[in-house]
Amino acid sequence: MEEDLKLQPDSETLTTPNSEVGAVELVKHEEENEQVEQDPGYVTPPEDGKEPVAALSEPNYLGGEDDVLLKHIARQSTIVREALKECTQTPLTVEELSRAYEANLFSPRVPPKKQPNGTCETNPRLNFYPVFAVPEALATYHIFFKNQRIPLSCRANRTRGDGLLHLKAGAHIPEIVSLEEVPKIFEGLGKDEKRAANALQKNETENQNVLVELEGDNARLAVLKRTIEVSHFAYPALNLPPKVMRSVMDQVLIKRAEPIDPQQPDLNSEDGQPVVSDDELARWLGTQDPSELQERRKMMMAAVLVTVELECLQRFFANPQTLRKVEESLHYAFRHGYVRQACKISNVELSNLISYMGILHENRLGQNVLHCTLQGEARRDYVRDCIYLFLILTWQTAMGVWQQCLEEQNLQELNKLLVRARRELWTSFDERTVARQLANLIFPERLMQTLQNGLPDFVSQSILQNFRSFVLERSGILPAMSCALPSDFVPLCYRECPPPLWSHCYLLRLANYLAHHSDLMEDSSGDGLLECHCRCNLCTPHRSLVCNTELLSETQVIGTFEIQGPEQQEGASSLKLTPALWTSAYLRKFIPEDYHAHQIKFYEDQSRPPKVPLTACVITQSQILAQLQAIQQARQEFLLKKGHGVYLDPQTGEELNTPSLSAAASCRSQKHATQGKQASHRATAIPAETTKAVGRGGDVGRQPGRGSFRRGGGGADGELGQPRRGGPRGRGGRNHRQRQGTIFQKTRSEPTSENYPAPATATMFTESQP
């Protein structure tokens, strides 16, 4: 009972001290024999200022003078203190503190250090940031969307969409259009689409849902249309940088309306007025017809708001070098083709590499084989949507860099260029000409090349999946409860798409072209050499083991030789074909002459040979490669046919001429057959001693140390591992242990008597033998 009356010691993890003002203690009520709470009032703190530490009630490895759990708070406090160093004033709100915290974590002034393998070292400061949160400091341009009503002619309402998007050999890269070329837009279902029977009654009362149940819907779209009801979608922003478009609008079309200053009202008199007046435009065009002037203004408006954006998109993505790098990134994202072949030979998962803004990272948590779980139309829709999102992510990254790099001085120079070219723009021949001239001013060649050199990034399917969920959530669609893809809400052609969404239509068509051009729509791999086969121009024929025989021969001699220079020469280098060396050369192997960027032109569909001869990666001379392969094959045959005894690899110590157990069984059966023929003329009952003599008989048996195809001879009844009595050595010692592990090396067709001595140079081989 006395133990129950004592004060219980505080737990070490508590933050409230024992001597706190107003602390509560338990006492014993004498009359009722029960515990009651009493306030002892103010307790005088200790003179030294340190609180007494209560002893632990039970052993705890986290205790001691310094509580290890406090290190977690100390580290976080250090990070917050570093984030506040650059602030001129102490943040007073959570928003300001979060902005400073994210800027210090994700946008430091000093870039992260690079490791020897090229990736950035891990940042332990990120351990305190929410794991699955999207930092606002990184999503500078990706948070902008274009909320618009979904066209009734979108991909989800086209039952024959997969067939319309199918591209055959010879198809070309998609082009852009203008409003002059496509003056009329159709956004209906079309006469070929038939509503489902249960969708007629449903849509009578629900007119807000754009997705219509059709008879020919596939399984995914049928489930999607029964799961969600949507009318608008948040399309990711593809606009040019706002700073650039503001200058274009102010100097070409119409001046912005600024807030009216009551003290100086005359300064804002021209706000909201056209930059080019009717009189000035009539003088430039040489006509006074109001209809012609109005048509010219419509053309300029369409060129500035729609066509110039398409022109910049096409210039950026249609470049052959950009297309090649985009397809290379897709091969990494889908672990496809030559990337899969390199991973197999190097035994390194190259698809774990991701990058952003030119900084390379290694992330082993990403997935790159998710598309392998799908078949048919579902796989094609998923691959097409992944590439569509990848193109959007790449373009938004470029626009974000462009927006952040622009200073006030750059905008002033741009305004001067636009003012100088104003008359030329307004008097151009057509809409496409205006868009090209305007793109030359705002998107010059130097800027485009700079962005193309740093883009696109390496991504994984997990990154694209997170981006997909981010887009769907902004549109009010719960990804976990629906099987929607952002590309489902984009029309398939320009004449069925409203002009504000033409950029998305172009990227969807370009994604479909890249999916076919990269041979991602279908699985072309097989067994054997076809395990990593891909028909695209990046892989076939120069990187394909099926088509390039010299490349196949080179892979067979990887790690089997080492060429050394003269020892007397200083700095003499050696050549050793390692998997890492071969993989690096294999990834860099690209033949631009046989790469057809703007047309689907697979090697297997061509009747002509490649423009550049097929060669290996490292050893490009076929004579040297053939000689190395012949040497390797001769050494293997020598060890298999004429080698006796045990040959050890000087580097690994493994036995080089140890055959399989099947060879030993075949030789044992051959020996029993020979013994049966020699003893057929004798009586049935033969003593054991006679049988042993027959087993060792013949010319081979009389040679000491050469009996029964092995050093040390054979046993009484053909068993392995027993020394013969005429052998030069006994059972014991190291030589006996080596002979125990030796098995047959001869085949049935070889003679039973050979006098070839063991090669004296066998132990000097530096090649790795099978």
Curated annotation (Swiss-Prot):
Location in the cell: Host cytoplasm
Record keywords: Chaperone, Eukaryotic host gene expression shutoff by virus, Eukaryotic host translation shutoff by virus, Host cytoplasm, Host gene expression shutoff by virus, Host-virus interaction, Inhibition of eukaryotic host translation factors by virus, Late protein, Methylation, Phosphoprotein, RNA-binding, Translational shunt, Transport
Biased amino acid composition, Basic residues: 726-739
Induction / repression: Expressed in the late phase of the viral replicative cycle.
Domain of life: Viruses
The keyword RNA-binding is assigned to this record: yes
Keyword Magnesium found: no
GO BP terms in the entry: intracellular transport of viral protein in host cell; symbiont-mediated suppression of host gene expression; symbiont-mediated suppression of host translation initiation; viral translational shunt
Sites bearing Phosphotyrosine, chain numbering: Y332, Y647
RRM domain segment(s): 315-433
PTM entry text: Might be cleaved by the viral protease. Phosphorylated. Tyrosine phosphorylation enhances preferential binding to tripartite leader mRNAs and allows ribosome shunting.
Additional remark text: All late proteins expressed from the major late promoter are produced by alternative splicing and alternative polyadenylation of the same gene giving rise to non-overlapping ORFs. A leader sequence is present in the N-terminus of all these mRNAs and is recognized by the viral shutoff protein to provide expression although conventional translation via ribosome scanning from the cap has been shut off in the host cell.
Function: Protein that inhibits host translation while promoting late viral translation by ribosome shunting. Blocks host cap-dependent translation by binding to eIF4G, displacing MKNK1 from cap initiation complexes and preventing EIF4E phosphorylation. Binds to the tripartite leader sequence of viral late mRNAs and recruits host eIF4G, PABPC1/poly-A binding protein and 40S ribosomes subunits on viral mRNAs, allowing ribosome shunting and efficient translation of late viral mRNAs even though conventional translation via ribosome scanning from the cap has been shut off in the host cell.
SUBUNIT field: Monomer. Interacts with hexon protein; this interaction allows chaperoning and trimerization of hexon proteins. Interacts (via N-terminus) with host initiation factor EIF4G (via C-terminus). Interacts (via RRM domain) with viral mRNAs that contain the tripartite leader; this interaction allows ribosome shunting and expression of viral late mRNAs.
Similarity comment text for this entry: Belongs to the adenoviridae shutoff protein family.
Protein name (record): Shutoff protein
Species this chain originates from: Human adenovirus F serotype 40
Gene name of this polypeptide: L4
